[in-house]
């Protein structure tokens, strides 16, 4: 307990992706071990730590709004995370409501910095730097360099001298994100993430396995493997097939029901990895493929690789091994130079691909990216119209794909039971964005249980399912199918 403050209560607020969730839970473990009390109620906290997102403009606005709302509680407010790392002193200057803006290099001693905030001691705002320059260009040289130079890498125990700090779960969900790696070596022209997340750095397999076993002990049934580019896992460990060998080991951990891989780079997705994900028992046949577009010309301007035909061939390869596999993607429309022909090609690709979930984003300039300086920018109203058109198409296509699953059997991980309405996800559904299963006649199935069900109806991207063997209530079935 601090001599300066008898009360050291902290609330963690997490924005953005699942990678940020992992970072927040490591920060929570750090703070708990150093005597801070973690609470959920921001209004009762002495300090609110906001783990910000700095990915796109809407996410940055959400981060600022959350920081302002935290300030309104009367607590001290500390900004961490990607937006804080990316903008640092600039954010501090424009947002005086934040009592401190801390970058990744502060994470190992966050508890001490929060003590400073409570004591009224000024903390110099984080000064951003290009984190790609902090590790060697050669991937295999990075693990040793990261250890020797004490480079802070979120989700990797921060730095070697503080490694071993326990992660602390912030909810009791049966799903837990597990970080494979941090950073990215790709240079997509529209993306700023590598500049503030740094070069790609894999976690050691034994470290990943150890954390996975701990998560299972905490009640996690599904492990959601996250990184900026999971297909690169192991390239800096002199083993480009490391993920293929890691997956069955993760799936074999006691208490783990399923392992799910996120963020696969299509151009790097090798046949061996496709087979491992599609056929390994305990690994969800689920492919989160970041296509972004399908026009080869647009992809080249994005500094990406692929084409409509190569992407369709990859999808065919997946479905030959696992016909019911879930395949999701994101696409960007209105990229500089995108012609009507490019736009039509993207829509044709989506129609032929029959994806289970599609996120549609309109292009907008991001600070510090190559694409921000491109010519051929489309008017904002044209971009908005294309977003609307592709979104409508995507909604129709994913609803058709969901309807195709009616009559099939799925394994549903129950995640919520709210006033008798039981919901969860099947193997083809990733968390939060890919739809869910509504379980009728659940028969007392509890959160964390896996239930063998038959799909009886669809409602958009969502499925209505009934446990196999449950008595059929024709009126309930009729009502469930009305929205399909």
UniProtKB/Swiss-Prot annotation:
Gene Ontology BP term (one): tRNA modification
Cofactor note: Binds 2 [4Fe-4S] clusters. One cluster is coordinated with 3 cysteines and an exchangeable S-adenosyl-L-methionine.
Chain residues that bind [4Fe-4S] cluster 1: 17, 53, 82
Keyword Signal: no
One protein family per Pfam: UPF0004
One GO MF term: metal ion binding
Chief location: cytoplasm
Enzyme class: transferase
Domain MTTase N-terminal, first and last residues per copy: 8-119
Protein name: Ribosomal protein uS12 methylthiotransferase RimO
Source organism of this protein record: Saccharopolyspora erythraea (strain ATCC 11635 / DSM 40517 / JCM 4748 / NBRC 13426 / NCIMB 8594 / NRRL 2338)
Lineage: Bacteria, Bacillati, Actinomycetota, Actinomycetes, Pseudonocardiales
């Amino acid at each position: 307990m601090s001599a300066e403050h008898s009360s050291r209560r902290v609330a963690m607020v997490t924005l953005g992706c699942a990678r940020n969730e992992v970072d927040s839970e490591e920060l929570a473990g750090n703070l708990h071990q150093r005597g801070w009390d973690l609470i959920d109620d921001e209004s009762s906290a002495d300090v609110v730590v906001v783990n910000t997102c700095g990915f796109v403009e809407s996410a940055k606005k959400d981060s600022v709004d959350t920081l302002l709302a935290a300030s309104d509680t009367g607590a001290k407010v500390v900004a961490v995370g990607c937006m804080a790392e990316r903008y640092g002193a600039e954010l501090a200057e424009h947002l005086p409501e934040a009592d401190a803006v801390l970058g990744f290099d502060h994470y190992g001693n966050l508890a001490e910095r929060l003590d400073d905030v409570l004591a009224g001691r000024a903390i110099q705002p984080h000064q951003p730097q290009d984190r790609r320059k902090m590790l060697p260009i050669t991937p295999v040289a990075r693990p040793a360099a990261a250890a020797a130079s004490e480079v802070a890498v979120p989700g990797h125990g921060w730095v070697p001298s503080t490694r071993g700090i326990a992660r602390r779960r912030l909810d009791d969900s049966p799903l837990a994100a597990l970080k494979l790696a941090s950073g990215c070596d790709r240079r997509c022209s529209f993306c700023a993430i590598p500049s503030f997340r740094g070069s790609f750095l894999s976690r050691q397999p034994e470290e990943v396995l150890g954390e996975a076993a701990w998560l299972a002990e905490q009640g996690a049934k599904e492990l959601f493997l996250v990184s900026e580019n999971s297909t690169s896992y192991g390239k800096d460990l002199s083993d480009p097939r490391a993920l293929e060998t890691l997956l069955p080991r993760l799936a074999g951990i006691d208490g783990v029901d399923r392992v799910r891989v996120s963020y696969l780079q299509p151009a790097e997705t090798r046949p061996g990895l496709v087979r491992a994900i599609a056929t390994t028992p305990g690994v969800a046949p689920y492919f989160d493929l970041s296509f972004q577009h399908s026009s080869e010309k647009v992809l080249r301007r994005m500094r990406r690789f692929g084409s409509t035909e190569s992407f369709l061939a990859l999808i065919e390869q997946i479905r030959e091994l696992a016909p019911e596999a879930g395949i999701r993607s994101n696409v960007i429309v209105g990229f500089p130079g995108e012609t009507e022909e490019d736009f039509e090609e993207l829509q044709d690709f989506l129609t032929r691909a029959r994806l289970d979930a599609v996120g549609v984003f309109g292009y907008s300039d991001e600070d510090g990216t190559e694409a921000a300086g491109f010519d051929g920018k489309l008017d904002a109203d044209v971009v908005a119209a294309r977003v609307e058109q592709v979104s409508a198409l995507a909604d129709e296509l994913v609803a058709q794909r969901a309807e195709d699953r009616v009559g099939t059997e799925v394994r549903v991980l129950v995640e919520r039971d709210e006033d008798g309405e039981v919901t969860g996800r099947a193997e083809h559904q990733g968390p939060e964005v890919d739809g869910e299963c509504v379980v009728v006649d659940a028969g007392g199935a509890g959160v964390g249980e896996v239930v063998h069900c038959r799909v009886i109806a669809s409602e958009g991207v969502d499925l209505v399912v009934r446990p196999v063997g449950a008595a059929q209530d024709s009126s309930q079935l009729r009502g469930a199918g009305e929205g399909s």
